[in-house]
Amino acid sequence: MKENCYTYLNFPISHLKLIDAAQPMTTYNNFLDWCKHKETISPNAKHTVEILLQISDTSECDRANELLSNTTELNLKNLQITDISPLSSFAQLTNLILGSNQISNLAPLQSLTNLKTLVVDVNQISDISPLSSLINLSILVLDTNQISDISPLAALTNLTALVLFDNKISDITPVQALTNLNALILYNNQISDIAPLRSLTALDTLYLYNNKISDITPLASLKNLKTLFLFGNEISDLTPLASLTNLNKLVLFQNKISDISPLTSLTNLIELNLGNNQISDISPLKSLTNLTELYLFNNPISDSSALQALNNLFLLDLYNNQISDISSLQSLQKLTTLDLRGNPIVNKICPVNPESICRF
């Protein structure tokens, strides 16, 4: 899941030798000074300087400074970096990748105001206030940290993609100002109130799964949404989704849903997941003829006849329902996977060919 959120952020990186680190004690205004004093600075800072020298493929500070001062992209992912102070003078950087390190202090980044992409996922960050000055950011990835206060992000109105999953966020009020967002990834947090999302009408991708959401009324205004993940919440009323007619992918499993009639209008859906709910009447799905994947596992469904119109289905998951008659599924000739396990089927003959498609 995580890779799908920002696989486009990959940059090449050298295979670098790693060095032990500790806390910074001295500061300098530019990389050249950091480098020339690398034998007297803290082990943490020295480690970062050594990495930058290796990326530059030189041991000469002047040459490395010249090269690094002219590069616009740096990938420092997974290099055991703790102290990023030696980066503070590289104001020309537009893309900076710092994922999978041990960074807790982002203060050295506050002067890098030309950054358009910043990735600092899987670190030890709780305070993101230094980022408030980075107003040119378009893509910001901060997942898998210890962030609870996202108020510094309110100033970053040029953001088009914001990734904050696996944090400790409950209040998302600051995002209401980020009206240029196309993608917002907030799963695995502690969010219950999504009212601030109402203004984000440019969103086409929204991940909110595994939170504490019950009221999805604010989503009704997000008419450009194409992908919406809401599984693992406390949702029962789907009415606000009726207006989201551009949706292609909707994932709602593990909620408290029984009435799916609001989904009737979502005729552009290609993938729909309604597993682990309390749905018995699936007749509203008749109109969703563009569906290629439909997941209805773990529901109290007994009548599957409404599915016979969905003849574009490649995958149909009916695992663990109460279906006894599957003859109506014989019209689904494009199926490549049909999961019927856990149903009281009387005549266990696969309704489509070949029989290997069916799982009983």
Predicted regions and their residues:
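Per-repeat structural element of leucine-rich repeats
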Residues: 82-83, 104-106, 124-128, 148-150, ...
